[in-house]
Amino acid sequence: IHLSLWFYIFLHLIHARMINKIGILCTYSFPEGMAPTIRILSYGQGLVDNGCKVEVVIFQPKVGDNAYSLSGYVGGVKYTYAHKRDTNKSKLYKLFVDRPKSLLNAIKKIRNSHKEEKFDCILLSFDYPIYLLFFAPVLRIIGIKVGFIGDEFPEPIRRLKSSIPFSYKLAYKFVYQFISFRVLMTEALQRFYNELVCEKPTYILCSILNTARFDGIVKQKVSRKYMCYMGNMMLAKDNVDNIIRAFKRVCDDFSDVDLYLYGTPNDKDKSIVEGVISELGLGNRVFIKGRIDYNLVPQTLANAEILVTSQPATKRAAGGFPTKLEEYMMSHTPAIVTNVGEIHYYVQDNNTVYLVEPYDDVAYAEKMRYILSHPQEAKEVAGRAYNYAIANFGSKEVTKKLIDFLDNTL
């Protein structure tokens, strides 16, 4: 009996969770922001739900006003900005004073927190070589293991280039001497880094969402029915013009449904979108709604007749997975999605979403028409999408697997 008890205790110790505290270092706005912010917040809340402590350090100098303070807790996730930029200073001051202060303060905050309770690892959620060259070696010198989170190809490819400069390759090869593992969004990214830099233990995490945001959300009556696009409206990433042209083909047959575009495009992209709207005579049917409050997203998606997104078939699209897709699927609203990258690995046409090939506004319009003409069937598809998202994209479930990966890797 005693031997059996000791054997049970031994097995329990082997399988016990060893990951207790994780840091995430990033450059973008937090806790409010676009897709990268939403993903990191979902990572953090999922890890917290699984019993980990999570600290997010934002080292880019803070820009603009934010409803949140420079440090605090959101959903159990601790966050802090390394430095607040003085927006009245010159560009040279920001470059040579603000930026170094931010980098050094980030290290100081991480080191102090590490002294209080050791980090099991720090996840670097950026791919800029100059920052990787600074943070990865310094963190290892401090005694913290380092991992890399990647949800897109590096910057030149995000700008629709076919490859990255030779200098980037050299920088990555050096930096990865200090990085222990990767958490990547797609298999395409894994192949890219394995072939370009070196192989590392890799966990594929295509999508993640704090599903609790959608608890209790039901469709409400609205004064005017609408289809909804929600994203950053960057045309290199989301060719919204394809959606508008498709809508033009069906709008006369469904005169009670408008098209709402939520997002904050840059001036150039906004001008192009406005030009397409004007060219097609849709000024009274298609509306650029601007940025929407993070907390209003679930209800806005749920109230729509159709959720739409469109991506061009680019190398950039091959490396990523649209964060908006899991939000769409959680809303109980039917969604039209372009079949690019690895999306078809996870969703099926007419089963969980409505897939359409990229650039084909005629086929896209037919999907719109079909959904609006078959509301009951579309509702069933949306219901299956919700169940799939709960089972496969929920932050607690996904990060539990991530913790298992880290336990076996670190």
Protein language model annotation of sequence segments:
Residues K145, Y172-I217, M230-G231, V286:
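Donor nucleotide-sugar binding/catalytic pocket of nucleotide-sugar-dependent glycosyltransferases
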Residues L301-A318, T333:
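Acidic donor-binding loop of glycosyltransferase active sites
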Residues S42, I107, R111, I130, ...:
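Membrane-proximal helix-turn-helix segments that form the acceptor-binding/catalytic region
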Residues M230, D258-I272:
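Glycosyltransferase donor-sugar binding loop
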Residues D349-D361, Y370-P375:
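Conserved acidic donor-binding segment of nucleotide-sugar-dependent glycosyltransferases
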Residues I306-T309, E327-M330, P334-V337, Y354:
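Short hydrophobic beta-strand element within catalytic cores of glycosyltransferases
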Residues G23-L25, Q220-D238, I243-F247, Y260:
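Conserved donor-binding/catalytic core segment of Leloir-type glycosyltransferases
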Residues S271-L296:
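Nucleotide-activated donor-binding/catalytic signature segment of Leloir-type glycosyltransferases, i.e.
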